[in-house]
């Protein structure tokens, strides 16, 4: 019986040489159904079976980051494994050296935390990493420390940092300056309209700015960082990662995975097996983040508005409901401190913004959505940091990812969501700690539209959010509210 030979094909793929029967076993093991694929037009039209196959029997290739899973599967099936010399693990890295290097970067008020050193050490040991660390844990410092290290070890190669939005390009650049570095000397900001070529060693870019470029462009990079890398499941970002054929150091950071097995395995394949550095609950307990209080307000709608609806119809009703929107406005106006209202649909955001503006003259109301320019968003952020009772009406897409306002005292979920990524990122917006802000209140608006003893769609989504809160060890209370017509 022929054994199985594992070879590093390049920095993206592992090649598995084995008998056809073993290849079929591997193909079956690494084939997964995409969640909710049955609703996709390509599946409904029978153009695709809704499955993702991570191993190709034809080429024998699989993402290099999945090596631990390949090794475990083959061993459990009793196959003898031979490793090519390209897969010999690097020598152990002394953690004392890591700690000494990281501590040398401390300047001013910056104090490095132990879990940050652990995360940095994990990456330096293997050259790859998928760092799972929540909002407020200092992911940007972890990236910064690794950038500083790799600048010393990469001779003629540059470093690529990929972020989801132009706002986060500016934020990362600003964070590096806050850490006492000189990004204007070392970093090139790349987004719409920017020159794609530079002599600087570090390129900070949105994925939209570079995903169409060819492999030749990406050959200049020896290290890549992808911040908020849960977006790497998007085809464009996966395309970027697979063009970095000879990029040795590959690091992804994210606040959360979305809970699906295929999502996790794709990310781990592109980077490495994930390491959870810390949790929001631990950061709150250790006083690195504000105390979180979750108030789940379950609105009981009047009988005449309860009838069977399809999901889009239910969402449309909730976003347009005058009684519901009026309740949200009144709630926001009774809260002390800066308040963020998050909603999904622009029409609802516009309605809430107009109603709030009409009902108050002595509080600043800001409206932020996808069309709001990055410079305007940054201007709003600066104003709110100096305010005590501002109200921001914003879309989930914009504010759940990357606008960093520390002085947020209250968050209102005005639209029902069940995405673990969006929920946790949105909560993270309010957990930043400041001298005069140690508490954050989340008001999760849920809707009881049960009809004929059958739960409505968004009430089921609320149950999903409760599950997330429980898994994250958040304290929450459920308060029933009768909604007047």
Which residues does each PLM region occupy?
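Conserved helix/coil segment N-terminal to the catalytic DExD/H
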Residues: 192-223, 234-239, 398
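Conserved pre-motif I regulatory segment
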Residues: 51, 84-132
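Conserved segment of the helicase C-terminal RecA-like domain
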Residues: 429-463
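Conserved helicase ATPase core of P-loop NTP-dependent helicases/translocases
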Residues: 170, 186-198, 350-351, 363-400
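A short beta-strand element within the Helicase C-terminal
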Residues: 221-222, 394, 401-416, 425, ...
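Post-DEXD/H (motif II) to motif III coupling segment of the RecA-like Helicase ATP-binding lobe
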Residues: 230-293, 469
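Walker A/P-loop
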Residues: 126-149
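Conserved interdomain hinge at the start of the Helicase C-terminal
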Residues: 306-344, 350-358
């Amino acid at each position: 019986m022929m054994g199985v030979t594992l070879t590093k094909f390049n920095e993206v793929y592992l090649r598995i040489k084995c008998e056809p029967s073993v290849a079929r076993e591997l193909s079956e093991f690494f084939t997964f159904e995409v969640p909710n694929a049955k609703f996709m037009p390509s599946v409904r039209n029978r153009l695709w079976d809704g499955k993702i196959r991570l191993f190709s029997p034809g080429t024998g290739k699989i993402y290099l980051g999945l090596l631990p899973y390949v090794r475990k599967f083959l061993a459990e099936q009793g196959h003898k494994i031979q490793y090519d010399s390209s897969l010999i693990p690097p020598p152990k890295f002394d953690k004392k050296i890591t700690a000494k290097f990281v501590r040398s970067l401390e300047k001013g008020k910056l104090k490095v935390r132990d879990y940050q050193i652990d995360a940095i050490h994990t990456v330096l040991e293997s050259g790859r990493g998928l760092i799972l660390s929540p909002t407020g844990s200092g992911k940007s410092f972890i990236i910064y420390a690794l950038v500083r290290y790799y600048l010393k070890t990469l001779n003629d190669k540059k470093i690529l940092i990929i972020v989801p939005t132009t706002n986060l390009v500016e934020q990362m650049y600003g964070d590096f300056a806050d850490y006492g570095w000189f990004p204007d000397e070392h970093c090139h900001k790349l987004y719409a309209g920017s020159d794609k070529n530079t002599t600087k060693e570090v390129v900070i870019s949105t994925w939209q700015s570079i995903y169409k470029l060819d492999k030749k462009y990406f050959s200049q990079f020896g290290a890549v960082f992808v911040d908020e890398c849960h977006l790497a499941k998007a085809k464009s970002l996966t395309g970027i990662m697979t063009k970095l054929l000879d990029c040795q150091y590959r690091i992804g950071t994210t606040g959360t995975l979305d809970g699906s097995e295929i999502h996790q395995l794709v990310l781990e394949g592109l980077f490495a097996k994930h390491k959870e550095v810390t949790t929001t609950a631990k950061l709150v307990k250790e006083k690195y983040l504000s105390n979180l209080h979750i108030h789940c307000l379950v609105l009981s709608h009047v009988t005449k508005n309860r009838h069977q609806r399809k999901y889009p119809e239910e969402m449309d009703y909730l976003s347009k409901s005058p009684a519901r929107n009026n309740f949200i406005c009144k709630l926001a106006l009774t809260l002390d401190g800066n308040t963020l209202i998050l909603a999904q649909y622009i029409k609802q955001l516009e309605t809430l913004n107009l109603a709030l503006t009409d009902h108050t003259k002595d509080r600043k109301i800001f409206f932020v959505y996808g069309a709001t320019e990055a410079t305007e968003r940054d201007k709003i952020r600066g104003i709110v940091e100096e305010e005590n009772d501002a109200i921001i009406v914003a879309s989930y897409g914009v504010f759940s990812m990357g606008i960093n306002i520390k002085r947020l005292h209250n968050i209102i979920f005005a639209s029902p969501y069940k995405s673990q990524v969006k929920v946790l990122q949105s909560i993270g917006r309010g957990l930043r700690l400041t001298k005069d802000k140690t508490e954050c209140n989340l008001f999760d608006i849920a809707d009881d539209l049960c009809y004929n003893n059958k739960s409505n769609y968004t009430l089921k989504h609320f149950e999903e959010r409760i599950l997330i809160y429980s898994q994250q060890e958040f304290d929450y209370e459920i308060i029933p509210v009768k909604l007047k017509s």
